[in-house]
Amino acid sequence: MLLLALLAFLLVSRTIARPSYSMVDDTTPEPEEPPAKYQISKADVFPVLPGEPLDLRCPLADGPLVTWTKDGAKLEVNNRTLIVRTYLQIKESTTRDSGLYACSVLKNSHFFHVNVTEASSSGDDEDDNDGSEDFTNDNNNIRAPYWTNTEKMEKKLHAVSAANTVKLRCPAREPHPSNEWLKNGKEFKQEHRIGGYKVRNQHWSLIMESVVPSDKGIYTCIVENEHGSINHTYHLDVIERSSHRPILQAGLPANTTAVVGGDAEFVCKVYSDAQPHIRWVRYIEKNGSRFGVDGLPYFKVLKAAGVNVTDEEIEVLYVRNVSFEDAGEYTCIAGNSIGISQHSAWLTVHPAPVNPLEDNPVPYYMEIGIYSTGIFIIFCMVVVCVVCRMRQGAKKKKNFTGPPVHKLTKRIPLHRQVTVSADSSSSMNSTTPLVRITTRLLNSTDAMPLANVSEYELPHDPMWEFSRDKLTLGKPLGEGCFGQVVMAEALGIDKERPKESVTVAVKMLKDNATEKDLADLVSEMEMMKMIGKHKNIINLLGACTQGGTLYVIVEYAAKGNLRQYLRARRPLEMEYSFDVTRVPDEQMTFKDLVSCTYQIARGMEYLASQKCIHRDLAARNVLVTENNVMKIADFGLARDVNNIDYYKKTSNGRLPVKWMAPEALFDRVYTHQSDVWSFGVLMWEIFTLGGSPYPGIPVEELFKLLKEGHRMDKPANCTNELYMMMRDCWHAIPSHRPTFKQLVEDLDRILTLTTNEEYLDLSAPLEQYSPSFPDSSCSASSSSGDDSVFSPDPMPHDPCLPKFQHVNGVVKT
C-alpha cells in the first residue's frame, strides 16, 4: 500500500509541474509536442531565395558526433544535401526546404528557422495569393474561368534589361482550371530558352530568370476548364546590356556515374558578353575539414583556360581512368569583370564488373603451352615463305637475261629555315619549312622491263596521319590552276568523338600539278603543324600522306569567305541591280562588324606570336563558319598567286598591291607591321560591307598617291575612333604602326561598349561601296588593261575617282 501511495504522489506531482499549452479556448488542450518546438523563439532566422544554396554552420563545439535534423527528422546526405560535421549545405533550395533545422552535439542543440521565399522582382507581387486560395462551389455554380485581379494585368508591355528576372501573372479562378503559356503563338517549352523557366500554378505566374534578348516576344496565358477558356497576352522587350556576370546553362554540368577504370565527362556551357575566364575545380579536405581558418573552402584547379585552349575545349572536363578517389563534387567556375557564376555536379563511382574468367583462371602451364605452340607455327610459316622466295628468285635469274630496270624514287625531306636576320619580325626569320625533292636511284632486277617510273615518298607523321578509308570526298569548294579544295566527311577525326563524322575541307593537287606545286602543298601542311591551333585561324585536322594522293584535311567554313559574306548581307538600298526579287541575308549591326574585326585581330595576334607573317591578309582570305566565327586562312601558302582581279603582274610574280604596305610594295620587305597595314585595308573592307579598296584608281596612279601620303576616306558606317585606328595602321613608318596586341585590346574595349541596336546608316553616301553590276564607264580609265589590280567601281552619274585625303588634311580628287 505504501508503494501504491508513493506512485500516485509522483504521477500527481508530474502533472502539476507540466506546463499547459492551449489555443485561445483554454478548455481545449493542445496535444503535447516535442521540446524542440518550443525553442523556435531562440532559433536563428535564415531567409533564403528559391534556387540559392542554403548554408548553415553549427556554432557548437565540434564533437565526435554531430547530428542535423529538420522538423525533428534526421537529415541524410544526398545529391542536394551535403553534411560535413558542423557544416550543412542544401543546393538550389525550394520552398519545401523551409522549416526548423537543428544541430546537436551530445546534449546541446542549436536551432535555425529557415524560410525559403520568392523574391519580388517585377514590382507587382504584393499579393502572391491571388487566385490560389481554397474555395468551394456547388455543382450548380460551376462556370468558366475568370480573372480575379485585372488591375495587375493592365501592364501589357514589359521592358526590362538583360539578366533580370521577369514574372508574368494572370490570376484566375473556378474549379479545376488548367494553365498554359504560349510564346509567339506556339507552345513554350523548357528547352526553348537557356536556363528554362518556372511556372507557379498556385500563383498563376510565369518566371524567367536572367532574361536575354532572345526572350523578346509575345507571351499568352491560357486558362481553361471544361466549361470555357480565357487568355491574356503580354509583350516582353529585353534591352541587352553587357554588364552582367557569365550565364551558365541550367542543368550543366550534370551528375555523372562511372565505373572504376572508365572515363567521365562534364560539360559546362557559358554565355557572356565580356570575355569569360573559365576553370574547373574540385573541393577537397585538409586535416579533416573542407574550409580554412578564413572560412573559404579548399579546392584544386583541374583545368583552366590558356593560350592554346579553345572555348570548346575548356567547357568540357574529362576524368580519365576513374578510381574511387575521383568520386565527389566537380565545379565549373566562370567569371568576367562583372562577377562570377558557378555550377556543380557529382561524380558517383561504382566498382568495375567482375570478369567471370577471373574466378576460374587458366593454369599458367596451359598459357605457356598455348604461347609456345603459336610461336612455333609462326616460325614454320616464316621458314616456308623464305624458301619459296628463294626458289622463285632462282627461277627468274635463269629465265630473264635482259638489262636491269632502274627505278627512280623521289623523296621529300623537310628542313627548317635557318635564321639569317637579327630582326625577329622580318620575313627572313620566319619558321617556314623548306621542302626539297631529291632523287634516289634504285636497281631492281625483279621488276618488269618497263620505262623509268617516278614515285614520291612523303615522311610519315603518326600524330597527323589519317586513314583514307574513313574519308568520304564530296562536292568541290574551289580550285586553282594546279590545286583544288573539296568538301568531305571524316569519320572519327575528332579524337573526343571517335564514332561521329565531321564535315571538313580537303586540299589536294590536280593531275597536271608539278613538283613545285607538291612542294608548296607539303610546305603549307608543315607550316600549319608548327603554328598549332587557335579559334580564329583555319586549323589543320589531319593528312593522308601514305598510299595515294596527298590530302591535307583542314576545318570547313560553311559561309565562305568574308568578302562574299559581307556583300550578301548588304541592305537593298546599297545595291545597284535594283532586283526587287533579291532578299538579302540578315542585316548586320555595327557590333557585328566590330566583332568581325576583333576576331581577325585575335587570329593575327596569335600568328604573330608564332612568328608567322601572312603577307596576303584580305577579306577573301578570311573564312566564316556556320556560327559566324572568323577564321584566317592561307597563312602557310607560298605567295605565287594567280588572280587577275586583285594582283598586278610583275616580273617577280603576282602581288596583292591593294593590300600591300609601301615597304612591301616597293622594297619587297615583309614584316608583322606590313601585315598591320593589310589589316587596316581589311577593316575598310569590313565597314564598307565588302567594298573594293581604291575603286577605279589605276596601278601607276596608286603608287604615286601612296608615296605622296594619300589614304582612303572614312567609310560611312565607321566611327571616328575606328577610322583613326585604320589611319594608324596605314602609317608610312612601320615602327609607328600599332601591334596586333594593341589592336586586340582597343577593339575589345570598343566591342564591350557597343550594343546590338546600332544598325548601319542606310542614308550614307554610296560611293564607299563597290556596285554589284559589272564595270562599264570607268574601264577605260585603267591604264593597266587586263593586268590591273583594280576592278573599277563606277557610280551612277558620279565621277569614277573617289576623294582621297592627304596626311596634312588637304582633300584632293
Swiss-Prot record:
Q: Which PROSITE patterns match?
A: IG_LIKE, PROTEIN_KINASE_ATP, PROTEIN_KINASE_DOM, PROTEIN_KINASE_TYR
Q: Name one GO molecular function term.
A: fibroblast growth factor receptor activity
Organism, by scientific name, is: Xenopus laevis (African clawed frog)
> Which GO CC terms are listed, alphabetically?
cytoplasmic vesicle; Golgi apparatus; plasma membrane; receptor complex
Residue ranges of region Disordered?
119-143, 771-801
Please report the PTM annotation for this entry: Autophosphorylated. Binding of FGF family members together with heparan sulfate proteoglycan or heparin promotes receptor dimerization and autophosphorylation on tyrosine residues. Autophosphorylation occurs in trans between the two FGFR molecules present in the dimer.
Q: Which InterPro entries match?
A: FGF_rcpt_fam, Ig-like_dom, Ig-like_dom_sf, Ig-like_fold, Ig_I-set, Ig_sub, Ig_sub2, Kinase-like_dom_sf
Q: Which residues are glycosylated?
A: 79, 115, 231, 255, 287, 308, 321
| GN (gene name) | fgfr2
Instruction: From the Swiss-Prot or TrEMBL record, give the protein name.
Output: Fibroblast growth factor receptor 2
Summarizing the function annotation, the protein's role is: Tyrosine-protein kinase that acts as a cell-surface receptor for fibroblast growth factors and plays an essential role in the regulation of cell proliferation, differentiation, migration and apoptosis, and in the regulation of embryonic development. Required for normal embryonic patterning, limb bud development, lung morphogenesis, osteogenesis and skin development. Plays an essential role in the regulation of osteoblast differentiation, proliferation and apoptosis, and is required for normal skeleton development.
User: Which CDD domains did the record assign?
Assistant: IgI_2_FGFR, PTKc_FGFR2
